[in-house]
Amino acid sequence: MARSTPIERYRNFGIMAHIDAGKTTTSERILFYTGKSHKIGEVHDGAATMDWMEQEQERGITIQSAATTAFWKGMDKSLPEHRFNIIDTPGHVDFTIEVERSLRVLDGAVFVLCAVGGVQPQSETVWRQANRYKVPRIAFVNKMDRTGANFYKVRDQLKAKLGAVAVPMQLPIGAEEGFKGVVDLLKMKAIHWDEASQGMKFEYGDIPADLQEKAEEARTFMIEAAAEANEELMEKYLGGEELAEAEIINALRTRTLATEIVPMYCGSAFKNKGVQAMLDGVIQLLPSPVDVPDVTGTDVDDENLAMSRKSDDKAPFSSLAFKIITDPFVGALTFFRVYSGTLNGGDTVLNSVKGKKERIGRILQMHSNNREEIKEVLAGDIAAAVGLKDTTTGDTLCSIDQPIILERMTFPEPVISMAVEPKTKSDQEKMGLALGRLAQEDPSFRVKTDEESGQTIISGMGELHLDIIVDRLKREFNVEANVGAPQVAYRETITLADVKSDYKHAKQSGGKGQYGHVVIELSPLTAADRADAKLAPAIKDDFLFVNDITGGVIPKEFIPSIEKGLRETITSGPLAGFPVVDVKVKLVFGSYHDVDSSEMAFKLASSMAFKQGFAKAKPVLLEPIMKVEIVTPEDYQGDVMGDVSRRRGVLQGSDTTGDGSASIINAMIPLGEMFGYATALRSQTQGRATFTMEFDHYEPAPNNIAEAVMKKG
C-alpha cells in the first residue's frame, strides 16, 4: 500500500519534563490542536476506524497509550502535512527506566521547562539521559502566565546548569498576568492567539516598540547561530548579505540535529498560547527517521558482528518492542517502533532475542481519543500489536529470513525485595498471574518464589516502585495483598587474589564409586578482566570461569559440569546466602578416574572447592549504595543533613534551586538506611521536601552491619 505520508515528514518525538513543568497540559494541547486539523480515518486508505472510547467508558478503564499518532500542517496551514508519533515519557525520576525506554525509540524531544522554577534537579537528570542517547531537542518554556515567570532566567540556566547553547526562536510579549503572546524572530512579527477559539486562531502584528531592540539583538544571535552551520553561510553573513528564512531554518536544523544548539520557544499551555508555534518548530527543527543514524544491532549467531538497518520500507523488517501494557480486556498491548521494512497484520515475525516466532494478530494505531485497527505499518511507524505471547520490553521483532538483534536496552538489577502474599488463599493463583503480567510490562521488576520458605518475593528499584506494584495489584487485578518488611539485595565477594583451593570428591567403597578432583584459583574480577576482549564475552552474572587445564588431566567432557557446579554455588553465597559477584575462578589442575569419574562427581567437587576457597579469600558482604537527591526549604537544611549523616550517608555537595527558594542536597546513602525515609523526611520538613533516589553502586558493608545480616541469614 502506498504511503500516505513520506517518511521525511514523520516526527517521532517525546515530551520531556520534570514533574511540575506542565507536561500533561502541554501534551493535551498538542493533541487538541493536532486532532482538530485532521479527520481521523483517512490515515490508511480504507482502514476501519474503531472508536473504543464508549467501551472504555462503560468499563471504567482507560487503555493508557505509550505513543499517540497525530497530524500537523503548521499553525497557518502552510506546511505539508506531517505525521507526529508522540512518545509518552514519565516525569518522575523514580521511573528512570521509563524515560530510558522512551528515549531509546524517539528521534527528537521537546523539553518542557517551567518559566518560574526553571532548570530543576529532575530536569538535569532527564537532560543527562537525553545527552547519553544524543537526542536532538527544542525547549518550550511553559507557564509564562504564572507569577515569577522569567524567560531570560531560564535561557541563562540552560547554559549555566545544563551546558546548552540555547537559541531563542521567540521572545515573550509580557510575562505573568501580562503575558500576551510572542515575537517570532524568524518573521520579526508579533503573534497573538485568539482566546475565544482556545488558540485555534491567531494573528500576526507589529512588535511592541519596547521590545524592538531586544528582538533585534535576539534575531542577530539566532542568525549568528545559524551561520555557524557551515562556512558558506558564515561568509555570506559576514559579507553583510541577508540570509533567507529557509536558509536560517535549514542551518538551525543542521545544528539542532547535531545537538550543538537547543532552539527555545515559550508560551502558556494552560492559556492556549505558544504550543502551536512550538509544533511548527517540531516540523522545522526536529529530525525525521531518515535524519538520524541508521539503527544498529548484531548478528543473531555472532554478537560481535555489527549490523545496521536503514529507515526504508524496502529494507528487511526490524522493530523494537519498547513497552508492554496489560489491559484486562484486550490482553497484552505490545508497543513497537518500526525501524525498517513493512509489516502486515497476520504476518509471522521472529523475536530474535528469544529465538521464537510470533504471529502478529491485530495492529492498532493510537490517536488522541480513539484507537484504529490498521492493516500494515511502515518504516518509522509506531504502533501496538495485540496478543504477542513471548515478547518482553527491549526485544527485537524482525523478518525471519534476515534476522537482526537491535541494540538492547539496559535494565538495572533490582535492589530491594519484599515478600508478598494474598490476603485470601483463593487469590494465590490470581496474584501469580497478575505479578507475571506486571513483570512482563516492567523489566526492572522481578518475581520469584523463595525455595526454602515458599514465599513469593517481589523485587524492584525502590520502596516507591514496589508500593506502586502492590497498589496496581489491588486496582487493576482486584488482589488484596499483605507485604513483608523490605529486604536489601546484598551481594558477596572476595578481596584476596590467587587463592588456591584443592578438593577431591571420592567415594569408592564397593561397586561403582564416585571420583572428581579439582584445583581452582579464586581472584576478584578486575576492570582489566572486563576490558579484555578474550575474557569479557565469558563474563556472565559478574562471574568469570577460566579453564586452564592442560595435558588432559581432566577430560574435556567434565569441564562444563565443573563450571555448572561453580555457577550453581554462586547463586547463594557461603556468607549469608546472597549471590556472589565479581569473582574469577581459574581451573588449574585436577585428576580423574577411568571408571568412577562422572559429571555429578566433578560438579560436587567444584562446588566444595569454591566454598572452601571463598572462605580463605577474605570474603566481604556488599551493600547497595543509593544516589539520593533531596530538595528542601533552606530552613530545614541542617536537620536534613544531620539525618543523612545518621543514615551513614556521605554528602556529595549542595546547591540551590533555580529560583533560590530551596536547597538541593546530594548524598550517597546505603539502601538499608533508606527504609521509611519518605515518612521521616515529610515529618522533618512539614511535608515541604522531596527526594529522589536511584541505585549507584555496591560497596563493602561495615563489620557491624555485615555481622547483623549474617546472623539473620
UniProtKB/Swiss-Prot annotation:
Subcellular location: Cytoplasm
Residue intervals of the tr-type G domain: 8-290
Pfam families hit by this protein: EFG_C, EFG_III, EFG_IV, GTP_EFTU, GTP_EFTU_D2
GO biological process terms held by the UniProt record: ribosome disassembly
Transport as UniProt keyword: no
Keywords per UniProt: Cytoplasm, Elongation factor, GTP-binding, Nucleotide-binding, Protein biosynthesis
One GO location term (cellular component): cytoplasm
Binding residue positions for GTP: 17-24, 88-92, 142-145
Its biological purpose: Catalyzes the GTP-dependent ribosomal translocation step during translation elongation. During this step, the ribosome changes from the pre-translocational (PRE) to the post-translocational (POST) state as the newly formed A-site-bound peptidyl-tRNA and P-site-bound deacylated tRNA move to the P and E sites, respectively. Catalyzes the coordinated movement of the two tRNA molecules, the mRNA and conformational changes in the ribosome.
Protein name per Swiss-Prot or TrEMBL: Elongation factor G
Organism, scientific name: Stenotrophomonas maltophilia (strain R551-3)
